[in-house]
């Protein structure tokens, strides 16, 4: 640990004083830029943030529109900065990249970019990069309520653009600095507006003051409560995808991800703990963190600010904004500043002020640029050697190619392909049928990913098991493979499969009605992940649909076609629309969802049940309520909200937990309770939920909500799984307590499970073997009803990630999904979030089934 021990209290008090009285721009510049010695140090034509905004930085929270306007103002007054809008957030706020470099570099920026790109091409010599500028990426406020860094972004950009110092001019000649000034504008404005709304004058430092205590969902996450710092690999959010596209245009040499942590901490920067390093990443990459750390330490030493390194934070997973660049030959760094969460707050170090937190972030940012310029040659060598070593590492792998794809699920196949292309991974079409590891893949519906490629390490991250690391104390998830989560068939081949042409863009969705106007019915195979979207669109237009609870084969215009259990049947008779109007409605849903609709001329099947069978059941139109508010796990309920909004296009009501006993529940067919604490729900609300379930409602719970539902007798008759073992009361070292507690955490493990594919909740799941994400310690006993345990974790499970032996024994054989029939309704209990982080499509389709088929899953009804 490196811990600088100069007294920090006088600096905090000085910053607190600065809050209480207006400061001239010159005085504020002296506070944030103590290295600038006089007023002539800056170009007077370039406005300071204070001059433009009308208030001193740190005296209030800057809204995103103001931040955007300031960066645009800088571009009006200087030829050293260009501002590009690369996208918009879900709430419509601009996403920016600001490029800061010397004017002469801007004049040849594309030439510089192309020259720099030779570093990531193993076939190009190191000399091809020449003396091109080093590329630095500064990413701010990915967690919206870690607010100091976006304020620091304005000051850092101002300094680089306006400083007249010879050193700064050298930096701009030898560096291209990319600013992502607010990666999460929706969350940041949520936090900024709260802090501004509850600010007092004079400011209150009481940690219990409302200014410091954000309500649900807080500003950490984006509009859909996504943790964007864990979305760099999955890229589920439109906030994430544009910046990754820019990342791959530039491949920065250094990337800093600015964060905040608890108020009683100091400042953290890497190197990270050696036990948290990925074996996929060359040791030289991690060693360079130590080189860059010298410049961060120097910057904070000059301020007398406390800091530490080498503790706490993982550094092995490409899901993070500081580790994703490590997987591309850059030096990625997480920095963490103790957060004031308001203008001033009491801490163990004294009064912690907003300006003080901002100043540390400015110092680290400028120290990063200084370090990158000074170490440019070594950084170029590092990146060149990284991609060359990727080919050598790939050659040593037993698996030579990965194949993926499912002819019956083009939607998820296409989605996984799109993700790979976003990461610049080489993918080729499968031009001949192959069987790999017992799985069959057809030409035209599957793809090949060669392992021998420059992006090998990212290929491994997506398809292979997360390699074990030395540590067993984790900050976040312990496994991150994407392919198992998608639920699409994939396999690794020990022999190289060449494949056909390289894929440069995903194919367009082939949504259409095949065969013209139907005389009897239309049918959609439920195995296509987008079938649910088509169903929601049809029901939204008043079209009634049915679901076949058993497979059938029938004649179509394309010949005999087999449909899996769960497939949709839309009869022509009895609809509010007829003839051409019904055809156009069905065709519109097919085009929008990208699914194929078959035309049926008869209700008689070639094989399996006929279309008039009791096994072809009428579907009710779902009316869904999502419970979200204080106590609810925001990221979990946000994933359900995202699934309904963005995947199904199905509207949902958002209820506060305290509303459950006050609003009429009978309007809802489905209520979803994600993980969280529901102890605040009173007995009146519990009784209302019980009556609603008994009358035919379907209550969907997961994680701690499932535990709560069992304890409240909402899922009467069900039992929790093995309780955690009693604590070992033998004597332990005081200093080991955090590590011991962390070892027993369950945090993001991929486990193998068995799924009953004949159950309505599992319709569309292609195989009995299912990967599930285990994220908590809740376990469920299999149901006493033999037909009601839908998913059960294997005994023993195959584990991808770290899971202690004690926890392996606890989860083995437990139920992961079961149905508890209660009167005319039911409670659908998941042990974990089935839509985890918005990319677990292999299990979020179980939640989709619970929404559409929830009234049809009780054993007596299903076999009635």
Named regions from a protein language model:
Residues 28-176, 224, 230-231, 236-242, ...:
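Intrinsic-disorder/low-complexity accessory segments
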Residues 1-11:
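Bacterial N-terminal signal peptides that target proteins for export
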Residues 193-213, 233, 239-240, 252, ...:
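Active-site cavity-forming subdomains of large catalytic enzyme subunits
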Residues 181-185, 195, 258-266, 705-706:
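Short, solvent-exposed turn/loop segments enriched in Gly/Ser/Thr/Pro and often Arg
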Residues 10-20:
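Bacterial N-terminal signal peptides
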Residues 157-160, 174-202:
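Carboxylate/His-rich catalytic cores and anion/metal-binding grooves
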Residues 208-226:
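Aromatic- and acidic-residue-enriched carbohydrate-binding clefts of CAZyme catalytic domains
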Residues 20-29:
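Boundary at the C-terminal end of the N-terminal hydrophobic targeting segment
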């Amino acid at each position: 640990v490196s811990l600088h021990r100069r007294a920090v209290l006088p600096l905090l008090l000085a910053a607190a004083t600065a809050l209480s009285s207006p400061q001239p721009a010159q005085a504020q510049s002296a506070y944030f830029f103590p290295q600038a010695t006089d007023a002539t140090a800056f170009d007077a034509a370039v406005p300071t943030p204070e001059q433009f905004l009308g208030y001193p930085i740190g005296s209030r929270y800057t809204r995103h529109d103001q931040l955007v306007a300031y960066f645009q103002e800088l571009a009006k007054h200087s030829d050293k900065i260009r501002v590009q809008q690369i996208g918009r957030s879900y709430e419509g706020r601009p996403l920016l990249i600001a490029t800061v470099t010397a004017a002469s570099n801007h004049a040849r920026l594309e030439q510089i970019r192309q020259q720099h790109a030779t570093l990531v091409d193993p076939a190009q010599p190191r000399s091809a990069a020449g003396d091109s500028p080093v590329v630095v990426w500064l990413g701010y406020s990915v967690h919206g309520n870690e607010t100091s860094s976006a304020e620091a972004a304005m000051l850092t950009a101002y300094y680089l653009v306006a400083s007249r110092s010879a050193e700064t001019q050298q930096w701009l000649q030898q560096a291209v600095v990319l600013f992502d000034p607010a990666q999460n504008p929706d969350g940041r404005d949520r936090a900024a507006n709260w802090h501004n709304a509850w600010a007092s004058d004079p400011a209150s430092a009481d940690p219990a003051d409302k200014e410091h205590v954000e309500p649900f969902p807080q500003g950490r996450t984006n509009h859909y409560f996504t943790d964007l710092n864990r979305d760099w690999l999955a890229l589920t959010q439109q906030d994430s995808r544009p910046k990754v596209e820019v990342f791959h245009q530039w491949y920065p040499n250094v990337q800093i991800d600015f964060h905040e942590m608890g108020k009683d901490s100091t400042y953290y920067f890497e190197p990270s703990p050696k036990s948290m390093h990925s074996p996929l990443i060359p040791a030289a990459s991690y060693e360079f963190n130590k080189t860059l750390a010298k410049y961060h330490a120097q910057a904070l030493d000059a301020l007398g600010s406390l800091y530490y390194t080498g503790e706490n934070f993982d550094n092995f997973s490409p899901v993070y904004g500081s580790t994703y660049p490590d997987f591309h030959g850059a030096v990625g760094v997480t920095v963490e500043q103790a957060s004031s969460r308001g203008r001033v707050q009491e801490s163990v170090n004294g009064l912690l002020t907003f300006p003080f937190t901002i100043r540390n972030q400015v110092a680290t940012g400028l120290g990063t640029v200084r370090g990158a310029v000074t170490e440019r040659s070594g950084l170029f060598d590092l990146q060149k050697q990284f991609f060359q070593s990727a080919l050598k590492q790939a050659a040593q792998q037993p698996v030579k190619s990965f194949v993926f794809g499912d002819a019956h699920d083009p939607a998820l196949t296409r989605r996984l392909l799109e993700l790979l292309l976003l990461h610049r991974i080489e993918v080729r079409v499968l031009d001949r049928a192959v069987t790999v590891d017992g799985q069959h893949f057809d030409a035209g519906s599957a793809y090949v990913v060669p392992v021998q490629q420059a992006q090998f390490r990212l290929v491994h991250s997506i398809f292979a098991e997360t390699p074990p690391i030395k540590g067993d104390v984790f900050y976040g998830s312990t496994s991150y493979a994407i392919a198992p989560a998608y639920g699409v068939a994939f396999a690794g081949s020990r022999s190289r499969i060449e494949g056909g042409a390289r894929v440069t863009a995903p194919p367009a969705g082939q949504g259409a009605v095949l065969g013209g106007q139907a005389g009897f019915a239309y049918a959609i195979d439920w195995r296509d992940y987008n079938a649910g979207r088509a169903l929601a669109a049809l029901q939204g237009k008043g079209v009634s649909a049915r679901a076949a609870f058993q497979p059938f084969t029938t004649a179509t215009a394309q010949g005999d076609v087999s449909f899996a259990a769960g497939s949709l049947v839309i009869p022509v008779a009895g609809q509010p629309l007829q003839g051409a109007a019904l055809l156009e409605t069905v065709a519109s849903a097919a085009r929008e969802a990208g699914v194929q609709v078959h035309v049926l001329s008869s209700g008689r099947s070639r094989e399996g049940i006929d279309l008039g069978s009791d096994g072809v059941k009428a579907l009710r139109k779902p009316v869904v309520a999502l419970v979200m508010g204080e106590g609810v796990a925001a990221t979990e309920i946000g994933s359900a909200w995202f699934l309904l909004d963005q995947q199904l296009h199905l509207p949902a009501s958002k209820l506060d937990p305290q509303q459950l006993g006050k609003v009429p529940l009978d309007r809802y067919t489905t209520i979803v309770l994600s993980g969280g604490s529901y102890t605040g729900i009173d007995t009146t609300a519990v009784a209302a939920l019980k009556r609603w379930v008994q009358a035919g409602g379907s209550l969907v719970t997961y994680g701690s909500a499932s535990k709560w539902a069992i304890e409240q007798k909402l899922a009467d008759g069900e039992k929790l799984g093995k309780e955690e073992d009693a604590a070992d009361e033998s004597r332990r070292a005081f200093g080991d307590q955090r590590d011991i507690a962390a070892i027993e955490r369950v945090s993001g493990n991929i486990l193998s499970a068995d799924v009953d594919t004949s159950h309505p909740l599992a319709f569309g799941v292609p195989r009995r073997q299912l990967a599930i994400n285990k994220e908590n310690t809740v376990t469920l006993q299999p149901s006493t009803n033999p037909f009601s345990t839908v998913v059960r974790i294997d005994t023993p499970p195959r584990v991808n990630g770290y899971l202690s032996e004690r926890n392996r024994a606890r989860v083995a054989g437990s139920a992961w999904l079961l149905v508890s029939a209660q009167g005319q309704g039911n409670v659908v209990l998941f042990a974990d979030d089935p839509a985890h982080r918005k990319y677990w499509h292999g299990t979020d389709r179980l939640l989709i089934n619970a929404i559409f088929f929830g009234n049809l899953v009780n054993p007596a009804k299903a076999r009635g």
